[in-house]
Each structure stands twice: as C-alpha cells, then as structure tokens.
Curated annotation (Swiss-Prot):
Origin superkingdom: Bacteria
UniProt xrefs under PROSITE patterns: FLIP_1, FLIP_2
Protein name: Flagellar biosynthetic protein FliP
Protein purpose: Plays a role in the flagellum-specific transport system.
Membrane topology: Multi-pass membrane protein
InterPro entries in UniProt: FliP, T3SS_IM_P
Transmembrane segments: 29-49, 51-71, 95-115, 175-195, 197-217, 219-239
Length: 254
C-alpha cells in the first residue's frame, strides 16, 4: 500500500520540479495594473505559484491514474455486467468501484513496483534528480500502455500522431507521451465495449426467448425483464460468472 501511495504522489512530485522553473520564469516581468509585485517579493510569488500548481496536480492526479491504468477497462466491464443482468442498484456502485480498484492494483502491481524501485528509491536516496525521476517513473507506464495496444495495428497511435502533425514514428520510443496516453484511452474504451457486448449477448438471447414466450401466451402487458431477471441470475450463478469475468479481465492485461 505504501508503494501505491508513493505512486499516487508521483505526478504531484514530478510537477514540482517543472513548477519551480516555470514559476520563476513567470514572475520575471509580470506587469499587472493596480498590483505591485515589487513590494511582495519574487520568492513569495514563486512559492505561491508552486503551491497553486502542486495543489492543482494533486487534485487532477486521480483522473490521470484512472485513465493511465487498467481501471478504465475494468470499471466499464463491471458496469456492463450489472446492466446486462438488469440490476440497477445491486451490487452497489461503491462495491463495483472498490472491486475495480483492487483489481487495478492487482494488475498494475508489477508496474507500480518498477516505478517504486527504478524512480522513487533512487530519488529518495538522492541518486537522481527530478528530470531523471520523471523519465524513469514514466517509462514503466509507457511500456504498460504500449503493451496493451501491441495486439492491434496501432490505429489509435497513428490517428493521434496524424492529428498532432507528427511524423510516423520509427519505434515506440519516438511516440510522445501525451499521444500515447490519448491512444491508450481510446483503445481501452474500444476493448471494454467489445468485452461488454460479448457479456450482453447471452442475456439478450434470454430476453428475446422470454419475450417470445410471453407474446405466444398472450401476456403482452407483462414486462419481459421482470420474468427474465431470475433466469439471468440463475444462469450467471451456475456458470460462476464472477470468477469467469475476473479471470478474463486479469488475463486480458497479460
């Protein structure tokens, strides 16, 4: 858990190194009307800007972690399961998100461990500076994101490279990080929806069968969902659905 906490602070710590340079450059030559920065002092302004940027990064870091890890795919697939079973409130959203979080930690643990050993520990022992810390820390995440897209033709990377007016990269290292993140998010959405459709199919067939039987019996006013719900739950329990879904999600990242 300590490693996960250190990884959570990875984005905020790295931003501080860039904030120091940017804030010092910004305070030189500020000329706002009705404001006299000379009486305040450049160091105080720089510290205030650093604090503002640091708090902003800490606020946005959960969103970055959600989009750059396996949480995106896992959370969408688990939500598809609940909708396929026609269950609106069971299991509760908090439990679904908690399960997605712990599955994310399980699948991302090798990546988190690499960041901890290659970036955080050397920085803690003052063996590397902040720039080296950022490069060593982002490398395992880049490898993880690229590995998830290695099963296709890298259409997402080509799309965002062309939209950014970049030349075609010769290898993985030439892909900018912001392009890789955008491509990874799009790829995860596509994979999650494909998995969700496969989960939906057997339950849709069951709904169609129940609706056809009700129409044949003349029970048109009775909602088919009410009748098919118990059969969906029985089918899901008999095939050990949670184990199949969990193992399938974990194997999809290997």
């Amino acid at each position: 858990m300590r490693k996960c906490f250190n990884f959570f602070l990875f984005f905020s710590v790295t931003s501080l190194s860039f904030a120091q340079t940017k804030s010092l450059q910004t305070t030189n030559g500020l000329n706002f009307p009705f404001l006299n920065f000379d009486s305040i002092g450049g160091s105080e302004i720089a510290f205030s800007l650093q604090l503002l940027i640091l708090l902003t990064i800490i606020t946005l870091s959960p969103a970055f972690l959600v989009l750059m890890t396996s949480f995106l795919r896992i959370s969408i697939v688990l939500d598809f399961i609940r909708r396929a079973l026609s269950l609106q409130q069971s299991p509760p959203t908090q439990i679904v998100m908690g399960l997605a979080l712990f599955l994310t930690i399980f699948t991302m643990w090798p990546t988190f461990n690499s960041i901890y050993e290659q970036a955080y520990l050397p920085l803690k022992e003052s063996k590397i500076n902040f720039n080296e810390f950022y490069n060593k820390g982002i490398a395992p995440l880049r490898i993880f994101m690229y590995k998830q897209m290695s099963d296709g033709r890298h259409e997402e990377i080509r799309l965002f490279m062309s939209m950014s007016n970049y030349d075609r990269p010769k290898n993985f290292s030439e892909v900018p990080t912001h392009v890789l993140i955008a491509a990874f998010i799009l790829h995860e959405l596509k994979v999650a929806f494909k998995m969700g459709i496969l989960i939906f199919l057997p339950f849709i067939v069951l709904d169609i069968i129940v609706a056809s039987v009700l129409m044949a019996m003349g029970m048109i006013m009775l909602p088919p969902v009410m009748i098919s719900l118990p059969f969906k739950l029985i089918l899901f329990v008999m095939v050990d659905g949670w184990t199949l879904i969990t193992s399938g999600l974990i194997k999809s990242f290997m």
